Amino acid sequence: MKIAILSRDGTLYSCKRLREAAIQRGHLVEILDPLSCYMNINPAASSIYYKGRKLPHFDAVIPRIGTAITFYGTAALRQFEMLGSYPLNESVAIARARDKLRSMQLLARQGIDLPVTGIAHSPDDTSDLIDMVGGAPLVVKLVEGTQGIGVVLAETRQAAESVIDAFRGLNAHILVQEYIKEAQGCDIRCLVVGDEVVAAIERRAKEGYFRSNLHRGGAASVASITLQEREIAIKAARTMALDVAGVDILRANRGPLVMEVNASPGLEGIEKTTGIDIAGKMIRWIERHATTEYCLKTGG
């Protein structure tokens, strides 16, 4: 099988592991920078080019598309989809997951419990917005943020108003969310592949911080999750139509709450913490689904 990995940096842990796992299972792998792909969009003979050459058909494509290049990255992935390549996460699902507001609306519509969340455009609504989520302390998030960047804990109402006004001054879209104090700076990252949680870790914020992201200095340990948490993680990934997802869960007094669904979860922290070959599980999922029948069905 020929597999393309779409990534700006093939030296990153996740890309290297996916390449290694695919090669170990006998596949040919090429890592492509999506920003160096260019496309001929033609009803008679669509094609995709890379650094001066027309690319051959790939049986499958693994998108490792960063938030900053979501627009062009998903456009390149769509072109591969048009040509019959099986995507490990479809372009439309990635774009959907990158929109935090839309994601939360979809999850809420499916009855998945979330932290109480509000959004407003007008500065006149700031006070009501704070009251809507239960007052301070609360969390203010940039809709476009990632890896814990653009996330602020406002411990007082005055601080909340100041942060919201500052973000609005940057013409940024923001979410205001209740602070789950009982989570104590911890969350659970569930790695979902297909209809299975293949690994789970607890991420704990470093002392003096509340964000548990490993990129922000958090620590990780193996997590034992409940059946309810497992079912919620799978349902959240399915709601977003993602074959592979990192589902972040907060343990609140009222039950598990989904905080975020990540369409391109990093493998380093969770593989090194659990010792589980997640990259191999992702490749095996591709083997089961990137079939000749799929290629013919999609016109490749």
From Swiss-Prot:
Q: What is this protein called?
A: Ribosomal protein bS6--L-glutamate ligase
Q: How is the cofactor bound?
A: Binds 2 magnesium or manganese ions per subunit.
NCBIfam families annotated for this entry? PRK10446.1 (NF007764), rimK_fam (TIGR00768)
* Residues that hold Mg(2+) 1 according to the record: D248, E260
The cofactor required is: Mg(2+); Mn(2+)
EC number(s) recorded for this UniProt protein? 6.3.2.-
Swiss-Prot/TrEMBL keywords = ATP-binding, Ligase, Magnesium, Manganese, Metal-binding, Nucleotide-binding, Protein biosynthesis
Q: Lineage from the top down?
A: Bacteria, Pseudomonadati, Pseudomonadota, Gammaproteobacteria, Enterobacterales
Residues where Mn(2+) 2 binds: E260, N262
Q: Which GO terms describe its molecular function?
A: ATP binding; metal ion binding; ribosomal S6-glutamic acid ligase activity
Any one annotated GO CC term: cytoplasm
Q: Which residues form the ATP-grasp domain?
A: 104-287
What's an example Gene Ontology biological process for this entry? translation
Relate the protein's function as given in its record: An L-glutamate ligase that catalyzes the ATP-dependent post-translational addition of glutamate residues to the C-terminus of ribosomal protein bS6 (RpsF). Is also able to catalyze the synthesis of poly-alpha-glutamate in vitro, via ATP hydrolysis from unprotected glutamate as substrate. The number of glutamate residues added to either RpsF or to poly-alpha-glutamate changes with pH.
For this chain, the family text in UniProt reads:
Belongs to the RimK family.
Residues engaged in binding Mg(2+) 2:
E260, N262
**Which domain of life, per UniProt?**
Bacteria
**Which positions does UniProt annotate for ATP binding?**
K141, E178, Y179, D187, R211, S212, N213
Annotated Mn(2+) 1 binding sites: D248, E260
